[in-house]
């Protein structure tokens, strides 16, 4: 069961400490809030606002995706799958902390600072480019006392689009998304877009191109 507690968050100014030589610009909301494209080249606008709903485990999501998220979880649980939201909305500061910790971990393994940054960015989104900062992406894990990870991930991959969610980083689209396969990371795009992305076997970047 998810519970509601709303609050308004205004993002602070974004920094780009791990940008390197990547050309970037602020993400466009031209196609609507649900289709805003955030990746290594598209930063979250500094004035982006999100109204949050708190889940029963303390994680938060954009209030606009809450009904479909609850509906999807109800459907999965009705079929015997145990699952929960491991990660939801993150602040700029929380994303920066994750990056710092990953870099430090690689440095502790003997990697140089530049090597550690490069490796960390393969696993952790550069602050300002994480969909978790939008509040419309969730990391969903299996309750392994009830279901295996593979069973939950398979169910999500086959059914999430029905509720407006997509597997954001498929294994066969890494060259486009710039992110390795993440079977737990689901992003809300709305039912129409999710169905098109699923049926065509494309990723969000490719779908956005069809709208241009």
Region roles according to the model:
Residues 1-212:
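Extracytoplasmic cell-surface/polysaccharide-interacting catalytic and binding patches
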